[in-house]
């Protein structure tokens, strides 16, 4: 399932990030910790964005990007 569909406040493991055409966006996600094996938690949704907890930080990502991040419930 993709990250945009998960319930709030539950932990998920990133299993795959589908192809992102913009290299700078891909690099930014990588630098924020969005890599295979990382644990993420969606803490809220607001105006088409998700607030995600990853590696002890909270970051906002758009649903378009969240749809490319495939996760499994842990």
Model-derived features with residue positions:
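C-terminal structural segments of small proteins and small subunits
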Residues: 11-12, 51-74
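Short, conserved secondary-structure segments in the cores of folded domains
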Residues: 2, 28-30
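Short alpha-helix capping/helix-loop boundary micro-motifs
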Residues: 24-28, 45
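A residue-level detector for short acidic-glycine micro-motifs
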Residues: 5, 16, 41-44
